[in-house]
């Protein structure tokens, strides 16, 4: 509708901003007469907005909540705490600016689920609140339900919750069921868990067929629950608005490799395994002789063993950035070695590629457990950390042994389900249309 004005409130940490911007781009393209005011910190916007946006997305920089002259400690939770303390007032002020600039009142609040206080703001403004959960179905269910049932939990598994029978308490994010329940992150999740059932709609990057039992559970929990993924397929390269970026020639390199032979390694942009583990990964790659692409930030390349880059120049490539989705979808891709972040898991599922997971923090262990024990499309690295022998054994298991063949078979089946979900009249295709209708309401 011509008069709709959607306020998008981003959570400016990790990959959250990137995820909600991707959805906002697609919505804005599908609804050119709707204005989307995108509110995010200047630092996060600077890292995200490298390409042209649809003209109906208006970008607004907001404060990060850090007082002028304040020096942050090395504790990453401090920045989150300062932002959350200041964010309600910061967002309120900028929303007034956005309404003045657009000349329209906000008609819908589209926010990261971590911006839990947006429910109160939407109620004050008498508009709908549409919340985006950026992780998986199991972490959403845990964050909104299990944290209130700690006393009734088994010491080992979450079998008391339908669809969670193979999940262990130790797989859950710290600060939800175990660990420091007074941390900033734990308190934020608790507040969010109480607030989300009030949302008009909760949506996420997944597809119903991946976890049908959990989909049913979440539909009962929320007023409206929509799975609109995998976003890597729904927002496919055929709809790409900017040229493919491959500055290091990864795609030209992989075209020369055999089917299902290449190891792709990437641990995300936020955290990386410690230097000692990077060393043994490098040693394992060199010893195994498998072809590889390793996406590793330049600041971490200093930790690689002396002579590794020269010694493996014909075997593989280490680059500061790689076109992950395109690499995973190449027929030469054999296995994805990852931290187990949700976006990476969904991109691997979308491509039908098995995984080796090395969880680092947050929902990584939960996602890795789903990969290994629920969907059986990969494995978690032995003992949870990289060792040279353990890494080589994992590569051999996935790429060569019968276990790996089963993982590949299961991964291909999930890929087919994912493709069906985003096809015309598929579940995610229809759910995205439902999301679009919701945000366009006046």
Curated annotation (Swiss-Prot):
Enzyme Commission number, as recorded: 2.4.1.-
Gene3D superfamilies documented for this protein: Glycogen Phosphorylase B
Record's keyword terms, sorted: Glycosyltransferase, Transferase
Top-level division of the source organism's lineage: Eukaryota
The keyword Glycosyltransferase appears for this protein: yes
MF terms (GO), sorted A to Z: UDP-glucosyltransferase activity
Enzyme class per UniProt: transferase
Name the record gives this protein: UDP-glycosyltransferase 78D4
Gene for this chain: UGT78D4
